[in-house]
Amino acid sequence: MEKRVWDWGIDLGGTKCECVVLDGDEVLLRHRIPTERHGGYQHMLGQIAKLVDECAAKLGQHPALIGMGTPGARDPQTGLLKNSNTTEFNGKPLKEDLERRLGVPVLIANDANCFALAETHLGTVRQHHPDAKVVFGIIMGTGVGAGIVINGQILNGHHGIAGEWGHNVLLPEGPECYCGKRGCVETLISGPALEAWYEARTKRRLSLAQIAAASAHDHVARLTMDRLHLLFGQALANVINILDPDVIVIGGGVGNVQSLYRAGRETVLPFLFNPRFATPMVAPALGDSAGVFGAALLARGVFREALLS
């Protein structure tokens, strides 16, 4: 009997790398190990190989193909990774280096694309908006990014940067961004950016969740949340005016702020080229599992031909 080919996915982060192996919708295995970023690029490649070997030993089967979600994106012209906040990966031929190490084809996609793909095919979009053709899947946490799924497949774009709304400039004189620009969305409404804005005015360091909870009685906390809502609405309206998605999924730590679904939503309309804002804004169903599940979906049949070409 021919051995069944399972779907292997790896979510590569700056802190940990996680592997999942799927048989259809069934999770056969989940396993994670530290990325050990301090060891440098070659050491991190070794950690990924170690993760694959450990999973293969548990399953008694090596992968035929691996999907991988990465910070940053693979440049379609050069094949090098770029725009990663785990800067050790930038300028490196990650796909080719991993294929040499692992001995199997590796399909690479931005981690936000993997998030959007998983929520479309396995998560909240499949459950509640199955007819959606265009999905904008937002991650708002330490950074701000997004993935775009159209007719079930990732949109990468000519430069491989489709969905990177976190690096649209909102305030040209705003804070410096690691990308080299100033006033990017990420420098304004990421979790660390909002926490820093609050701390600069109060000399108190609170988490965003604590700031949100204090906003009913703390004036600066209220201003911080107002800033989030206003800039979120402006930034999202710019996306909607171009993409006009059927559904918007909001993940990440900032995405857990419930007022985004009310006050944040209300601030979209003044910047929108339409008299109403009717697009569903929904929370993800898969939590922090979405990225690794999306990576596994990269290795599933319907995506292989497009991504290998």
Where would I find each of the regions flagged by the language model?
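Short hydrophobic alpha-helix segments
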Residues: 31-33, 85, 158
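Adenylate-forming
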Residues: 115-121, 146-148, 168
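Short beta-strand segments
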Residues: 11, 67-71, 109, 136-143, ...
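A charged helix-plus-loop insertion that forms the helical arch/lid used to bind
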Residues: 79-90
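ATP-binding/phosphotransfer module of carbohydrate and carboxylate kinases, centering on a glycine-rich
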Residues: 1-65, 75-78, 96-104, 121-131, ...
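Generic beta-strand structural signal
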Residues: 104, 133-138, 142-146, 150, ...
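ATP-dependent carbohydrate kinase catalytic cores
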Residues: 105-120, 129-130, 136-138
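Structural signature of FAD isoalloxazine-binding scaffolds in flavoprotein oxidoreductases
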Residues: 161-164
